[in-house]
Amino acid sequence: PQNGYLIRKRVSRKTNVKENNYQYRPGIVYRLGEAFLNYAEALNEYKDERTVREEALNYVNKIRTRAGIRTYTFGNSDAQNIHVDDNQETVRKIIRAERRVELCGEGVRYDDLRRWKEAEKKLNGDMYGMNYSGKDAEAFYVRTPYQKRVYNPAYYWFPIHQSEMDKNENLRQLPFWR
C-alpha cells in the first residue's frame, strides 16, 4: 500500500510506476547541498568566532533559501528569519539537523554519526518501524520493533588489513581490533 514512506530522490519526475514508465536520470556523485553542509560544518568546528559562525550559517541558509524556507539569523526573528543563539554548539546542532533533512536517504547518516562519535548512542538498541502488514490506518501506525542493533566501539575505525601488517613489523593494529 502507498504510505508516504518511499523517498523519490534521484527519481525522474516523469517516472510513473503505475503505468510502468521509468525515465532515466543520471546518478549524482556529489551534490552542492552536501558541499555547502560539509563546508559549514568544517567552518564551525575550525574556530569558535562569531564571524566564522556567521559564514557557516550563511551556507546553511543558501540551502534553506533554495528550498523556500525560513533562514537562521543571530538577529531578531521575523517572517523570513529564525533567531538562534550565537554560540558554536547551537550552530553545530543546526548544521547536524540540516544534514539529516537535506541528505535524507543519501547514505551519509552512518558516516556522520561515526565522525561525530555519536553512533553508540544513536545506533544501539531496538529499532522501530510501522506495521507494514496493517490493513487499515489504525493498525498501520503501530510502532513495531523490527531490529535490535548493537554498535561496538570498534566500528569507529576500520581494522588494518593483515597484509599491510605483514609488510611493516612496526605497524600495530588499531584499538579494539587486536
Give the positions of each predicted feature.
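Acidic/polar-rich alpha-helix caps and helix-coil junctions
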Residues: 1-178
